């Protein structure tokens, strides 16, 4: 045995025990068995429980031994010796005693050894030796030790559940006595030894009210395993299981257990139908499971079958899967098949048919995102042509007139009747009966919604149906304004005469091919329209712009009146009074139309929509003046809509929908065709404008306690590199005064934060206030500062909420701000920065009531002493010192320290030494109650020094002086480095990623 171990254990020399940590591991690794054998008789002595000196010596020796085992990875080699020491601890009382409930010395030793052993829970041979003894500590009455053992045994059960199966009785006794953490072990043990766990399963049900959600889930997972093999074991638990149905966390798995029980013995669940109904109502996601249980349990008699059928029919229209349960019940009891059942089935089928109608005809949603909206037509339309593989995928909305809507999918037209190859209008097809899902007819001038959306299987498909009264000339359905588009796409079909295809959305990177779905009927429209796009050099754009030219298929007589002018609501956000001077236009689609995309971010070209009308008779042309509408698109391009104007709106024979824009009352009339500008604005910007006074008052108050970060970035932490990387937010603070002696004139104080949500919210509010004070307007999410915060929030994924929800939520409360203040305090920010009242007389003053500046900017009179680098003392006095390795076990030494602008020097009985300030990398502060510094740790390249005032005073002054000197030294030596003088408590080694 090593000489130092021999002296410490033989003489119980506590003064030398701390020196054991100076001995290299290699010198004592072979003596561990002998050391443990020497410790065993010491702790077996009757006087050990009362001898504090012996307890301290043994605890230090055990800690050193366990440290050596861990570092040298020799746990398997010395496991037997450690287990022998555990057996010795088992012979003594391990329960906390006295009013302070202090842990007995043997319990402390056992806890240290057990935690060290179970670090190797994946090693089977070690677990074979340790588990039998470790389990014996469960009934010893030490709750803390038992709770820790539950966690250790859960880890061991992952790979070695078979080793725990012989100890199931001890585990169950500990669970029943209140150690519910062991419930997580039972499922693993059951999989390898079901006979050991099954008899105890019913005993767990009364414990559920005292368990937390994870422990309850562990019990139900065990029950789900048991009910598949031995359902009879849980028959007595049915009432308690039904009582747990209202728990949303475990409702689904409880239903699965009850379903297996109903299959085993249907009569068990008959008396609990009402509880099942209530559970399904509370948790709608369990309706299918509930229906299966009631069907399986109720099929035994006609009365119970009727109850089950009533439940199934109640939810059948919204749960198509329940038709199978209705079929089972009606097959068992045909008398139950009544008109009510038939009506429900028909309603469900009608809903499905309507969804198919929407999916196949009315809302042809391709992989490019095409939505077809039907307006009043009776003629069939051709199927969509597939887009070539190389074509970009787009989001498209197709607006088609339709007179009636059928609940039955319309078959695609044959080539003989399809209007693709014909230049004449298509003959009207016989309309199918309209489904009851649409009831309201539009009135003249009605700007409200005139129809309801039929149910669809995908919520992203938008379908609007219009049934315009014969002869009406106005009232375009307002839901058309939801087609927020700034681009135009064409549908093939030279004589389709009126398909209006409006494109929206960004172009995905991957090409997408379209399927060949049928398209709903469309009516003929009139005058052809030329839609062209040019870049700034006048060259037609074929990629990134619109290049569409239409040819006339048939000239519409003027007696038929004007056609529909439909344009994008986003294009028409800003319009003038001249824009709507009785303009009437139409868009018709040629057969050879090409699909193109107009990017919304770079629109330098002008898109024009104008009539290429044939020559009109003189009498007709005299009554029509030409109007021009110029509308801005994204601020730097124009949309020009020109064409003949008219005040005549005669009755049309084909009863198709159209819109008349009358400019005589354009300022007084509500335009149902276009969304108001306010609706299209950024909701965050609207929120800030509406609540700016509250935001300004709040930030003026908060600025007194919290500094605003100037920037936020992201680091990728490697703390958990073996499992995954972790993204950490990093804050950058600047001095807001920037005086001549500023510590951070060229650098930023940076710190990592564990509360990015609150900081991002505070930064957002601060950005808004500062921008408003300067520019008299608030920022939108498109501005660079706000968009950067939004990107950081999306990358961090702190919570399952959007950036808009975060910044429009309630302002951070006092307790949230206190957490941020503590972060600043622990990072050392408050040691080098101070808050002061903003000087409003300064033209470059801070926008808020208070400003945060570094110490030297707030106290320029003290700058000379800190910055001259001389040896003149700034602070001096006696400090207690510890340094070197294993400082925890070393004694404090009192020495006299002097801090100047260049050195930290000390004097003592052993002589004097000095540390150059430039060598100090950082200072870490240890704080006590009320955040008062107790000690501080100085880190250099080759040593670590712990200091604290001898009398406990002046610690805060020492920390501040050290922080300022170090900050100035680092800024002087590395003026471009963006680093803080006092790094926050490390979250892990990290590398910048954003």
Swiss-Prot record:
- Subunit structure, briefly? Interacts with TSC1 and FOXO.
* Record remark: domains: The PH domain is required for membrane targeting.
> Biological process (GO) annotations?
cell fate specification; cellular response to starvation; lipid metabolic process; positive regulation of insulin receptor signaling pathway; positive regulation of TORC1 signaling; R8 cell fate specification; regulation of signal transduction
Q: Give the matching Pfam families.
A: PH (PF00169)
Region annotation (Disordered) ranges:
404-461, 486-521, 536-565, 973-994
PH domain residues are 872-967
Q: How does it sit in the membrane?
A: Peripheral membrane protein
Put simply, this protein is called Protein melted
Molecular function per GO: molecular sequestering activity; phosphatidylinositol binding; phosphatidylinositol-5-phosphate binding
Going by the UniProt record, its keywords in alphabetical order are: Cell membrane, Developmental protein, Lipid metabolism, Membrane
The keyword Repeat is assigned to this record: no
Q: Where is the composition biased (Polar residues)?
A: 486-517
Q: Which SMART domains match?
A: PH
Question: Any keyword Cell membrane?
Answer: yes
Superkingdom of the organism of origin: Eukaryota
Q: Which organism is it from?
A: Drosophila melanogaster (Fruit fly)
Q: What does this protein do?
A: Participates in fat metabolism regulation by recruiting FOXO and the TSC1-TSC2 complex to the cell membrane, which positively regulates TOR activity and negatively regulates the expression of FOXO target genes. Involved in R8 photoreceptor subtype specification. During early embryonic development, may be required for ectodermal patterning.
- Which family is this protein grouped under? Belongs to the MELT/VEPH family.
Where it sits in the cell: the answer is: Cell membrane
Q: Which GO terms describe its cellular component?
A: plasma membrane
Q: What is the lineage of its organism?
A: Eukaryota, Metazoa, Ecdysozoa, Arthropoda, Hexapoda
Q: Where is the composition biased (Low complexity)?
A: 415-433, 540-553
Chief localisation class:
membrane
């Amino acid at each position: 045995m090593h000489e130092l171990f021999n002296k410490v254990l033989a003489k119980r020399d506590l003064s030398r025990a701390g020196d054991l940590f100076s001995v290299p591991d290699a010198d004592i690794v072979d003596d561990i068995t002998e050391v443990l054998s020497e410790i065993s008789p010491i702790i077996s002595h009757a006087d050990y429980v009362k001898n504090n000196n012996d307890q301290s010596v043994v605890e230090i020796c055990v800690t050193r031994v366990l440290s050596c085992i861990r570092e040298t990875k020799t746990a398997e080699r010395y496991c037997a010796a450690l287990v022998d020491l555990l057996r010795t601890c088992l012979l003594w009382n391990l329960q906390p005693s006295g009013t302070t409930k202090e842990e007995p010395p043997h319990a402390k030793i056992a806890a240290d050894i057990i935690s060290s052993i179970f670090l190797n829970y994946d090693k089977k041979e070690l677990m074979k030796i340790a588990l039998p003894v470790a389990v014996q500590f469960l009934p010893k009455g030490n709750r803390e030790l038992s709770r820790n053992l539950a966690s250790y045994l859960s880890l061991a059960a992952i790979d070695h559940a078979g080793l725990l199966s012989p100890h199931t009785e001890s585990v169950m006794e500990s669970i029943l006595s209140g150690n519910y953490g062991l419930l997580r072990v039972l499922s693993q043990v059951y999989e390898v030894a079901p006979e050991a766990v099954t008899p105890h399963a019913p005993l767990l049900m009364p414990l559920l009210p005292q368990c937390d959600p994870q422990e309850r889930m562990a019990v139900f997972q065990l029950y789900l395993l048991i009910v598949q093999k031995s359902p009879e074991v849980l028959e007595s638990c049915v009432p308690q299981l039904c009582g747990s149905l209202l728990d949303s966390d475990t409702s689904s798995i409880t239903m699965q257990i009850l379903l297996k029980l109903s299959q085993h013995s249907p009569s068990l669940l008959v008396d609990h139908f009402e509880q099942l109904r209530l559970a399904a109502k509370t948790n709608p996601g369990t309706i299918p499971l509930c229906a299966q249980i009631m069907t399986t349990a109720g099929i035994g008699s006609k009365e119970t079958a009727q109850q089950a059928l009533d439940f199934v029919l109640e939810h059948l229209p919204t749960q198509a899967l329940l038709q199978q349960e209705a079929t089972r019940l009606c097959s068992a009891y045909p008398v139950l098949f009544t008109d009510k059942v038939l009506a429900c089935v028909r309603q469900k089928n009608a809903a499905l048919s309507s969804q198919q109608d929407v999916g196949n005809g009315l809302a042809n949603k391709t992989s490019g995102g095409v939505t077809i909206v039907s307006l009043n037509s009776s003629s069939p339309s051709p199927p969509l042509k597939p887009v070539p593989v190389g074509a970009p995928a787009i989001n498209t909305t197709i607006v088609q007139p339709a007179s009636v809507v059928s609940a039955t999918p319309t078959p695609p037209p044959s080539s003989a009747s399809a209007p693709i190859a014909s230049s004449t209008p298509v003959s009207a097809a016989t309309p199918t009966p309209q489904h009851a899902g649409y009831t309201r007819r539009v009135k003249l001038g009605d700007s409200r919604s005139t129809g309801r959306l039929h149910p669809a299987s995908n919520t992203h498909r938008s379908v609007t149906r219009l049934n315009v009264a014969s002869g009406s000339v106005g009232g375009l359905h307002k839901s058309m304004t939801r087609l927020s588009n700034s681009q135009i796409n064409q549908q093939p079909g030279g004589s389709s005469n009126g398909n209006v295809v409006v494109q929206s959305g960004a172009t995905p990177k991957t090409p997408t091919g379209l399927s060949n779905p049928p398209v709903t009927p469309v009516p003929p429209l009139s005058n052809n329209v030329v839609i062209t796009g040019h870049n700034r050099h006048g060259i037609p754009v074929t990629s990134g712009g619109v290049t569409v030219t239409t040819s006339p298929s048939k000239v519409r007589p003027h007696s038929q009146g004007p056609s529909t002018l439909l344009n994008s609501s986003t294009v028409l956000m800003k319009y003038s009074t001249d824009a709507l001077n009785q303009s009437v236009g139409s868009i018709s689609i040629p057969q050879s139309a090409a699909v193109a995309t107009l990017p919304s971010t770079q629109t330098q070209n002008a898109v024009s929509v104008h009539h290429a009308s044939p020559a009109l008779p003189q009498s007709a042309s005299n009554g029509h003046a030409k109007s021009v509408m110029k509308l801005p698109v994204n601020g730097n391009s124009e949309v020009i809509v020109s064409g003949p104007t008219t005040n005549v709106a005669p009755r049309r024979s084909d009863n198709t929908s159209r819109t008349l824009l009358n400019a005589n009352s354009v300022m007084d009339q509500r335009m149902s065709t276009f969304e108001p500008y306010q609706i299209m604005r950024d909701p965050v910007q609207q929120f800030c404008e509406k609540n700016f006074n509250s935001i300004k008052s709040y930030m003026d108050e908060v600025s007194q306690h919290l500094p605003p970060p100037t920037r936020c970035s992201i680091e990728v932490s490697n703390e958990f590199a073996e499992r995954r990387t972790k993204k950490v937010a990093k804050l950058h603070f600047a001095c807001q005064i920037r005086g001549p002696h500023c510590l951070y004139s060229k650098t930023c104080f940076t710190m990592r934060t564990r509360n990015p949500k609150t900081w991002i919210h505070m930064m957002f509010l601060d950005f808004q206030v500062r921008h408003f004070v300067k520019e008299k307007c608030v920022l939108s999410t498109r501005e660079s500062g706000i968009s950067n915060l939004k990107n950081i929030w999306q990358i961090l994924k702190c919570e399952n909420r959007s950036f808009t929800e975060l910044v429009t939520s309630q302002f951070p409360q006092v307790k949230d701000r206190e957490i941020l203040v503590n972060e600043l305090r622990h990072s050392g920010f408050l040691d080098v920065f101070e808050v002061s009242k903003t000087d409003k007389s300064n033209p470059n003053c801070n926008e808020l009531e208070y400003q945060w500046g570094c110490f030297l900017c707030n106290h320029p009179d003290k700058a000379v002493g800190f910055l001259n680098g001389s040896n003149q003392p700034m602070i001096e006095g006696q400090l207690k010192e510890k340094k070197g390795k294993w400082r925890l076990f070393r004694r404090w030494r009192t020495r006299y320290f002097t801090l100047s602008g260049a050195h930290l020097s000390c004097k003592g009985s052993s002589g004097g030494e000095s540390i150059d300030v430039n060598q100090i990398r950082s200072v870490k502060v240890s704080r006590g109650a009320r955040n008062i510094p107790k000690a501080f740790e100085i880190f250099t390249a080759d040593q670590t020094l712990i200091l604290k005032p001898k009398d406990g005073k002046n610690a805060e002054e020492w920390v501040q002086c050290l922080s300022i000197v170090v900050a100035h030294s680092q800024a002087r030596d590395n003026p471009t480095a963006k680093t803080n003088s006092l790094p926050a408590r490390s979250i892990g080694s990290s590398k910048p990623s954003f």
